[in-house]
Amino acid sequence: MDYRKNLNYFKSSDKWYYIGLPIAVIGCGFFVCTLFYWYFIPYQMPIGIILAAVGAGIAFLPYSKCAKEAEIDEAVCAASENYSQEVSSKLSFEKELLKNTEPLTAHGYIYSDDVLMRRGRVDRVCRTSGYSVAKIFCTKYGLVVFDKSFSLTREAEHENMDSYPFAQLDFVSVVDEQFVCKDQSKIKVSYFVIQKDGTDILRLPVKHDVAVDKLCSTVNEMIGKMKNT
């Protein structure tokens, strides 16, 4: 992972793109008009070439020092898959896993005031410099959660493993929230939440889909059974 290029991406701005692009378009316009012998100003051809080159440089040169959005997406996807495989390869409690319940990989960008944030120019996805990935296993007695958070702009990561006995939990759920950015725009975010004694003891970024809803249903059913025994 190229931390410097990632840092440049999160600190970059689209303003140079929107300044340079019109200049390049005007330059190309002069160049094309000259080809059809339409002249509006003296030295139209060389001026058009210069404007096109300068505009393109202003618009696109800053991006050459930044990571592309696709590269960041590939990096977090690879990190998620690698961590998931790493955790699965060193399991020591396979016999205790609940049958017919697949482990869940929960992952997503970390949205907080402590991270750098940038909205994609094309896809408008709001990416941040922090990412979280977790592997959640459902055993006969409780949840076992391996989680890792890491930075995309510097060498920093944190790993943790905890077990959560069903009998001690209130419930688990997926919570959909809105995070308000510094520019006052809002982002929909989802968290896998474990609650104990009326308090959220774990919140993990997750994609809200059928798999996580199914896991929550299974876990809450197990919590109910344990509390009634």
List the predicted regions and their residue ranges.
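Phosphoinositide-binding peripheral membrane targeting modules
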Residues: 127-133, 139-185
